[in-house]
Amino acid sequence: MKEIYITDYNCVTPLGFDVESNWKALLEGKSGVALHKVIDNHDAFFVSKIDDEKLEIEFKRFFDSAQNDNFTRLEKMFLLSLKPLVERHQISDETAFILSTTKGNISLLKNESTLPEGVYLSRLAQKLADFFGFKTQPIVVSNACVSGVMAISVAKNMIQARKYKDAFVVAGDEISEFVISGFNSFQAIGSEPCKPYDKNRNGINLGEATAAAYITSTPSANEKLKFKVLGDSAINDANHISGPSRTGDGLFASVQNAMKEAKASAEQIDFISAHGTATLYNDEMEAITFNRMNLQNVPLNSMKGYYGHCLGASGLLESIIAMESALNNTLIPSKNFEEMGVSQDLNIIRENQSAEIKYILKTASGFGGCNAAIVLGKA
């Protein structure tokens, strides 16, 4: 089976418009989460949102001003993420273009009596692909909050099946009234900055971001970074439309399968980048899963305290930050965690610390019972 590598990546978030600025902000403990007015005639919510003015300035730095009105706010975020990668890697007729998103241009629906074409995820993917000159039909991965992790898996499996030689994966979602209203109806949104795994956690903060990665089976010798995608799995727990299996069955099976394919034991995993939404049931289910897999002593964090829950972007964005941790031999703390609030022990990272990181486990879970896991190895 071909070995698959991630050799390049980028991200656009409230903490910065490239990986370097994001990493610097994380080392300084900065968070994008703040109070923002999202819904008219409703109190502000704690969300992680990109400043509109800064986004416009950044877009005009890299793209012709005549193009400004041709793209939605989310599309501009996608273009900014992808542009550096497309400039560094050649697109061929054997290159896949994979889009991960949960809601795409859902904001286009507001105040519309008919369905705008741009709201279709396939149309969004095609528009982005056409702009950069991709020659293959785009692939859309939209499976709730595991979409970003699954997009990496899809790229890996498609290349190993010899359907493509390489792939550009881009993932993203934006803060919208639609999404905020939906999560609020579940009473899942926290009334303060989120505290994954903490005793006093009371819900999620939503966020927005885009992230992009280049994945190939033929890395060049001079790549600045190189991570093998060693194993992957996605299992549905078939429990409930909005609640995970209380015993973590779906996530357990996903982690077990991914580690088996990677031929990695619990002792070999150096770091877990977990989903950690700060909801009561998700965090508890993860703690049970990691203990079932004998991973309770592995250093673990959730990035939700920095970025909020970025939906379709979260899995890819958090994988990128995990790889940066490995490159810089630095573990980032799980922000806002103070006191253990799950029934089983976890090794929650509490402060910046040096560590040799070779094997990374990245997990995600979401509505509809979906779960996904990948194992990455520093090459």
Segments predicted by a language model, with ranges:
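Alpha-helical metal-binding/catalytic segments enriched in His/Glu/Asp
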Residues: 152-156, 210-218, 316-323
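Short glycine/threonine-rich loop-to-helix capping motif typified by GTGT followed
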Residues: 241-247, 277-294, 312-317, 351
